[in-house]
Amino acid sequence: MVCVPCFIIPVLLFLWHRFIQPYVLRFWNPWEKKDKDGNVIKDGSSTEFPFQCKGGVCPFPVKDKAKQEVAASGSGSNGTATAVGSEGEAEETKKSQ
């Protein structure tokens, strides 16, 4: 049989997180940035995507071109798993030498 605190505490935490906390955070949210008058500062850049590709060029290209080529060729049912498996085997052979 389960002890009473082991059953009651998770139920209370669920009720807090699901029903009570959203109402409390509407009126008291310590993580919101406020100015000296107490008004909430809304940062418009937080909702935008931080990386933009302009003129067809992305500043952050894909790191591993081998994975991209395997995915583009469409060989195998899961190209990522195949690429990871072959890389792991190559690393193991290097370590054993």
From Swiss-Prot:
Residue ranges that the Swiss-Prot or TrEMBL entry lists as coiled coil: none
InterPro entries: UPF0729_C18orf32-like
Biased composition (Polar residues): 74-83
Entry superkingdom: Eukaryota
Region feature (Disordered): 69-97
Pfam family membership, one: DUF4512
Family under the similarity heading: Belongs to the UPF0729 family.
Name of the protein described by the UniProt record: UPF0729 protein AAEL015238
Organism: Aedes aegypti (Yellowfever mosquito)
Organism classification: Eukaryota, Metazoa, Ecdysozoa, Arthropoda, Hexapoda
